[in-house]
Swiss-Prot record:
Source organism phylogeny: Bacteria, Pseudomonadati, Pseudomonadota, Gammaproteobacteria, Enterobacterales
Localization in the cell: Cell inner membrane
Record membrane topology: Single-pass membrane protein
Topological domains, Cytoplasmic: 1-6
Family as reported in the entry's similarity comment: Belongs to the AsmA family.
Zinc found in the keyword field: no
Name of the protein: AsmA family protein YicH
Pfam families cross-referenced by the UniProt entry: AsmA
Source organism per UniProt: Escherichia coli (strain K12)
Length: 569
């Protein structure tokens, strides 16, 4: 019996020595190489680490150094200087579920197709790590990341798991090519729902704070978002800049505050922007709300050729439409002011009062083409209940027929300027007058115009102007049909008899001042020459009592003989 006892003792000592030897051997480079090779050969993963460390002061912790881990045939998912694995009694029933995993000084490379990792942890901690996810939905890259996930149960394509609490900070981060620094993220994951209870970052030389939630269908609910002192330059057009907002199923905003922002793109810019938006939901190219509000002001706004100074907008949104409480801006050296309502039903914009004063505006070269284009889908009708203009300078630099109105004043009532997405003067009345004008190099003084319009005709009851010594007076009518049949009757007294030469009528065989009478008609159609449609008659008498009558048919004038109005003696 003593022999058997000694034998068992020797065997136990040998086992303890072997275990101790194996324990120390596994912590050598040889042990690390053999463990790495065994895992790589007997699983679908490749593993390599430089050394394994275990200390009796922390008996439940195993530390792997210089670790590389990933799926076979794919780039490494994890590269870390140190991986600290804390074990627990759970390993008896779930060997791959550990208590804590601490990753230090390394990089996690993630994609939407990342295969499920073969282990879990009650807590995943990151210390001075980096994230790279270039081909995922969010195109994420982050450096100096610290934080954790509780619990951590990774799934295929969901490296953080399907249900967990998250807390991260990052020294720098880039999300969809938008860089940020000093980032803080706190929240939770519940299957495909991501809740960010606390979000903060330094972005574009400013700050961003808020909280939001991303739902399973990809829609976002932003309860509160505040951006201050943003200074952002973008290479994208304004449409492309906001394209990501249209790519989500819907975006619900509880409160958005923008303070002192400066944004700039290739053909747009806004400086010193203050914006407050509340209770709005955007879906594709539409919006919904019960009680939405937008208040916005800026020092300067540029979009293409539109350049506004000190614009102020205050609006209220409802299911029925938009109440424009205030819009004011300095524009082209003057001031623009209006208020009104946009009605969703009928897509009608009704401006209660519109005032333009002090403008010095040159019309775009293609303004006639723009006038003939249809309006956007949201603007089926535009109505002005009241309109006023004061001391405006309007210039058209068309080389074929340049003109200018100086000190233009006017007023109008119940004007309909858009119907069925077409520009025009479809109803209402207007009166315009100016201190001076030039029409194709012909100077006149105090031109004035009075018109009324209905669904069938635009009637110009007064059209007059003073020349150097005389006066021109006319009446006209323009039909509302696509042909735009136009009739005009013009009388001139004490005017140059060839004053109409600059306006399209051939030179008369008369000289000097006199009286003229013109009746003409034609069709002012889009993309159709005017001259071939014009027919009319011109009668002129000069101060020498010479007279001539000419007739125009299809734009061609038949020459008339010059006769005398004096009786034959």
């Amino acid at each position: 019996m003593k022999f058997i006892g000694k034998l068992l003792l020797y065997i136990l000592i040998a086992l303890l020595v072997a275990i101790a030897g194996l324990y120390f051997l596994l912590q050598t480079r040889w042990g690390a190489e053999h463990i790495s090779a065994w895992v790589s050969e007997n699983s679908d993963y490749h593993l390599a680490f430089g050394a394994m460390d275990h200390r009796f002061s922390a008996p439940s912790h195993i530390v792997l150094e210089n670790v590389t881990f990933g799926r076979d045939g794919q780039p490494a998912t994890l590269v870390a200087k140190s991986v600290d694995i804390a074990l627990s009694s759970r390993q008896l029933t779930e060997p791959r579920h550990v208590d804590t995993i601490l990753l230090e000084n390394g990089t996690l490379n993630l994609t939407d197709q990342t295969a499920p990792l073969p282990f879990k942890a009650d807590r995943l901690q990151l210390r001075d790590m980096a994230f790279n996810s270039p081909n995922s939905e969010w195109k994420l890259s982050a450096q100096r990341v610290n934080g954790g996930v509780v619990p951590w149960s990774p799934k295929a394509g969901k490296v953080l798991g399907t249900k967990a609490q998250i807390q991260f900070s990052a020294g720098s981060l880039s999300l969809n090519d938008v860089p940020a620094t000093n980032v803080l993220i706190e929240g939770s994951i519940d299957n495909d729902r991501v809740t960010l209870t606390n979000l903060g970052a330094d972005i574009a030389r400013g700050t961003l704070t808020g909280n939001a939630q991303r739902n399973a269908d990809g829609s976002w609910q932003v309860e509160n978002l505040r951006m201050a002192d943003i200074r952002l330059q973008s290479e994208k057009s304004l449409t492309d800049f906001f394209a990501p907002l249209r790519s989500v199923p819907s975006l619900q905003i509880g409160r958005l505050e923008v303070i002192d922002a400066r944004l700039q793109g290739p053909d747009w810019a806004v400086t010193d922007l203050d914006l407050s938006l509340r209770n709005m939901t955007f879906s594709k190219d539409d919006w919904q709300t019960q009680e939405g509000k937008l208040s916005m002001n800026a020092s300067e706004f540029i979009y293409g050729s539109l350049h506004l100074f000190d614009p102020i907008i205050n609006t209220e949104f409802s299911p029925q439409g938009v109440a424009l409480r205030q819009f004011t801006s300095r524009w082209e050296g003057g001031m623009v002011r209006t208020s009104g309502n946009w009605l969703r039903d009928g897509k009608t914009l009704i401006l209660d009062d519109a005032a333009i004063a002090g403008l010095e505006y040159t019309l775009p070269k293609n303004w006639q083409q723009l006038w003939m284009e249809t309006t956007p889908g949201w603007l089926n009708s535009l109505q002005l209940k009241r309109f006023s203009a004061s001391r405006n300078l309007i210039i058209d630099i068309d080389p074929d027929f340049p003109w200018q109105l100086t000190a233009l004043d006017g007023y109008g009532a119940n004007l309909t300027l858009v119907t069925d997405h077409k520009w025009g003067v479809w109803s209402g009345s207007a009166n315009l007058n100016a201190a001076a004008a030039t029409f194709n190099r012909v100077d006149v003084r105090r031109p004035s115009l009075a018109l009324t319009a209905n669904s069938s005709t635009v009637n110009i009851s007064e059209l007059s102007a003073f020349t150097e010594k005389g006066i021109l007076e006319a009446t006209a009518s323009v039909s509302q049909t696509p042909q735009r049949q136009t009739h005009i009757s013009l009388n001139g007294r004490g005017v140059p008899v060839n004053i109409l030469q600059q306006w399209g009528w051939p030179e008369l065989p008369l000289t000097g001042d006199g009286n003229i009478q013109l009746t003409a008609s034609g069709d002012i159609q889009a993309n159709v020459p005017l001259k071939p449609t014009v027919s009319g008659q011109l009668h002129a008498v000069n101060a020498a009592k010479q007279q001539v009558t000419q007739t125009m048919n299809a734009g061609i004038v038949s020459s008339g003989e010059v006769t005398s109005t004096e009786p034959v003696r």
